[in-house]
Amino acid sequence: MNAILTLLLGIACTCARTPVHAGTSHQTELINRAGNTSLEVDRYARLVELSKLSDVDPQLRIDLNILLPAVDQWANERRNWNPANSSGRKNRFLCGYIQDEWPPPISETSPLYPIWAMYRGRSLIQRPIQSGGIQHNPERRAKYFGEGRRLLGIAREAFPQNKLVRLYLDETFPWPLLNPLDPLAPDWANLQRETLEKLSHIITWWIETRQAPDGQLGGGWGDDVEIWRTWAPVLVGFDDPIAIRGQTNVAEGLFAAEHMKGGYTSYMTDVEHTGEDSGDTCTSMMHLRPDDPVWQARAQRIFELFRDLWTNRNARNQLQFKSTYFTSSEVDTTSQLACDTVYHPRAVQPALLYWQRTADPEMTALFSDWMRTWIAAAAGTERGKPAGIIPSAIHWPSGTVGGLGKNWWDPQNHGESTLYLWPSAMGMMTNTLLLTSHMTGDPSYLEPVRTMAHAREKYLADPTEDPAPGSEAWCASKMRIAETLAKYRLLTGDTTFDPLLLQDANGYVRYRMTGDRKHLIKGLDRSALAFRINRASYMEEVRWTDRQLSFNRNYANHYANPKLPLPTLSALHGAVTGDFGDALYFPMNAVRWKTHARDIGALVTGSGRRNFEAELYHFGNTERNMGAELYLLDKGTYEFTLTDTVGGSSTQTLTVTSPRTQVRFTLSPQRRYTIELRRPS
């Protein structure tokens, strides 16, 4: 590894040659225009123009011939998509070329060197943004960032007008409102619209600018499939045709790939990565096309693999996954890799959603049996684990907590040291336990969630400084189970964990708990803040599609003072859908608005099995015909009341016959509305 880093950081100083003549004034002008523009396609065009000149110095032409293909790769992303590479591994047209020696070196004395440094510097910084192995290793991260910033400093000195270079060197650039504030609209609606409009802008840009004909977005299938998680407030919350088209292209393109013929990937790697291809695509499409038999069958196929291939009974006669590494046809039970983990709900994510919707009895039997294994593991104190704490892994076939690592909290079942280190993806497991309790009616499945919540409350009441790794206090300092507790609160109305939720939950959840809109406004403002600066960090500068919102967290805030706001969309998603958490595990979205996501404010103020309430504000200039598709209401007859704060109320009878009942209505421009559905008294 040291040799690789030496190679990485030494390229710039191993290739000095005799100084190159800068060329004619016209050539110098083209280079300066290429360097100073903040538009990649313009830079490429100026360099192509330079390459067509007949009087270019021979050495400068050599450097240009080296540099121009690299600029082409970065600037003309989708043009480099290759239809022959349907697997996606070779078709990562945004980042597949970023290797240890990219771009190939040119002379430091070349007039093109500052442009070379611009690409080399950004590629070095993008690597830790993407790689957890680098990001979580301070020494390695500092070397990548340090050399990247040094090179970008050279580029900035030569081309001070280039905003992309300056963005990486701690400058911020405003991203103005896409629409002016509406003085008639409530504060929550203006804030929500600001973020929804920009999120819709981002989604549209990605689909229209980067999506290839086969659905890929340039990061490779394994990363492209994750991008819908960012899009969820628009994709799940609204009937937005552009977002739906883009996500459908991703999902159908992925399942058309050869490696998905078995219903799950044929690539052997760990569950965090193998589970994404089918988990993200199938789950998203089950939100968009809940009655489509194709996607239902794909969810059932995953359950079959869970039942017949991936799991068995361990030495303690408990049902568990046999390994962290498996495909659609085989399981690698090498002892080092043989762990069930809190990440494993990802592998069966679509099947869990199918179970939630259908209450399939065989799924109930097997999923609840699997969760019993985790309840038992949480209750024990094996290997020094605190009682009541869910481990991050259970070893196969012994059933002991942890893996082959010397500590229970670090199974060491994967090359990236932090991926399965406790708490790992704990929220996936706690949400699955909550779902199991709901589906079976058995509160014992929530016992690990309760004991962990109490540990968290105890810690917050009297925080321990530097708690010993593996101790209860150490676990409590790291655990993040607020989403599960919030979904439990929405499901049951139980206020037991309200004090903890008021500290850990997002602003929308706090608003629904207390009725205090200051929590809502704070949460929506937090969502909007990050989208007020540095537009390019969400679009043009993203090289790995699973890191679309990671620039501030994974790079900029290592240097920014004050820290830049993080793009946190949980309050936005909650306000639009009524869910107290995300759409991945045990989604409880109450509504999908049957309209596009622009020029609208939609706030769910109440939801449950017997009621639904919301506020709406239409920012447009003409009437808006729209509807609401309602998901949580029990079957029966309801009174639907639409109240216009100017024109009064209208009431009609609505019969709910299925989990997805629609109601249609019309909104007039610049008016506040409330919606209420209740069972007649």
Where are the regions a protein language model picked out?
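Bacterial N-terminal signal peptides
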Residues: 2-14
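Glycan-recognition and catalytic cores of secretory/periplasmic carbohydrate-active enzymes
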Residues: 30, 35-46, 50-616, 641
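Beta-strand-rich interaction surfaces with strong enrichment in secreted/lumenal proteins
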Residues: 602-603, 614-617, 629, 652-654, ...
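Surface-exposed beta-strand/loop patches in extracellular or lumenal glycoproteins
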Residues: 619-636
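A short tyrosine-centered beta-strand micro-motif
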Residues: 636-640, 673
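C-terminal beta-strand-rich structural cap/linker in extracellular carbohydrate-active enzymes
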Residues: 654-681
